[in-house]
């Protein structure tokens, strides 16, 4: 009986992962449906994948002094699955290298805190097996980036159901299967 339950559970997990396998959803940060200060849209035509990005400027403030600030995104998932969240970011320094993020109504989580500064680069969540993966059902979802530290920039957001995929450069926005 226990073996049957285990095998059934393993089959369902594999089936769910297989349904979304290879799906990649990429969007530009400036497509946020809502931006609340101190998050600002920067359109300088130089940096960022499309010449624009979101930023919490250095010195703009962060919690607990400044509790406002967010960027809200909505996107469609074509098939249920387990996804890795990748963001193309630019960090000012060790005190400006993370966001708080929230997917749908799930608990908020820390995004970032790597040690690559003053360069555009990709960062992923979850980093380790200790963090819960992002299990997303087919349909509409909401992703919110909240003010945690100033001196941060966000250029692109990418969700991938392929655990082996690692973005290297600017990604083409849209859905790929």
What spans do the regions from the language model cover?
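Bacterial N-terminal signal peptides that target proteins for export
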Residues: 1-7
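Extracytoplasmic
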Residues: 20-177
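Hydrophobic h-region of N-terminal signal peptides that target proteins for export
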Residues: 10-19
